[in-house]
Amino acid sequence: MRLAVLAPLLATASACRLPAAVSPVRPPSSASSIRLPPATTDRTLSPLEAALLLAFRWQTQQQTGVHSDEPGFHGMLSELREYQREHTTQEQADASLRIMASLAGPFPSLFRPFAGEPWAPSALAWCTTKFLGFLVGATRLTQRRAGDPRGGGVLVEKCAVLEHGGCKGLCIHMCKLPTERMFAEQWGMPVHMAPNFETCECQLSFGVVPPPVEEDATLPTGCLGSCPLARDGAPSLDAFRDFT
């Protein structure tokens, strides 16, 4: 029965002629030289995306205890920034993990028995393109990673959270690290997320074990030069300078 449910996903994933994955980019050694341009992407959501954002934001409020009167996507970013100011990077990652786990429901346990199947990375990549747009914007399927023609890759063309949030700490501690941990521990599927802090692209590679964060060449040290929290002198600013 479960395989019958997954059949449309598998057929779609296997039939695609996938473009190559984006190669990881080694950023400047110091993130302070990176200044993101002003956000330009229009956050117009479909009814489904609006409903998903509402559910995500409600869970964010429940797990962080932070509430903003600002509506929609930007209100959610305001809540996450406020939580960052007062909590350690570990607390930020733990809160994000709880948010994602609560929204995933029973699906990780349903998927986990099939995590070792050759089609599993492609199936997760396909699902990601259908259900993640409300949070990050436009996505497209790619090969798993540069030089690997298998399916299982997703390119976030311009991550809305990074573009509008402008914070490396938000990207790493409340998205990249908890997402990689959640898929490995709960779904039984490794995934490597490789953000590009100059273009706001992010390459997801399902079925690829991420390197230790201190060895990840895609992550510069320090705060982005355009980070709003760095400009404001947030109390927890120093925590953003480290990856652990």
Q: Positions of the model-derived regions?
A:
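N-terminal accessory segment detector
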Residues: L18-L155, A160-H173, R181, H192-M193, ...
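Low-complexity, intrinsically disordered Gly/Pro/Thr-rich segments
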Residues: W187-V191
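N-terminal chloroplast transit peptides
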Residues: M1-P24
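Beta-rich nucleic-acid/ligand-interaction surfaces
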Residues: N196-G207
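Sterically constrained small-residue positions within well-ordered secondary structures
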Residues: L6-L9, G147, P195
